[in-house]
């Protein structure tokens, strides 16, 4: 399956960051740290339970240049897939 952004979930491995239970601003801060450790164009999947993270990750991706490929919510768990800028 390929999204309209061109992301093919089978083609690239994701680094997973679990921030469930953490409140603002910790999910975003942990994601920033994780992205800093990744190579350009690497994928980071973040799981969070803080509802404020929806806004935080959308704004962060626009301001930082990292691409937000997915933003989903299921049973109170938010999932974000970020692609580190090249």
Residue ranges and their predicted role:
Residues 3:
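Cationic, low-complexity basic patches in intrinsically disordered or flexible, solvent-exposed regions
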Residues 6-37:
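N-terminal first-folded block
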Residues 12-14, 41-45, 77-79:
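Intrinsic-disorder/low-complexity, polar/charged segments enriched in Ser/Thr/Lys/Arg/Asp/Glu/Gln
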Residues 25-71:
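Amphipathic, hydrophobic secondary-structure cores in small proteins
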Residues 79-86:
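Core SAM-dependent methyltransferase catalytic element
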């Amino acid at each position: 399956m390929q999204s309209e952004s061109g992301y093919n979930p089978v083609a690239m491995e994701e680094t997973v960051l679990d921030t469930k239970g953490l409140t603002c601003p910790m999910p975003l801060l942990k994601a920033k740290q994780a992205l800093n450790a990744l190579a350009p164009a690497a994928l980071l999947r973040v799981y969070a339970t803080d509802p404020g993270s929806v806004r935080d990750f959308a704004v962060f991706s626009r301001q930082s240049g990292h691409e937000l490929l997915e933003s989903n919510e299921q049973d109170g768990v938010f999932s974000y897939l970020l692609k580190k800028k090249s």
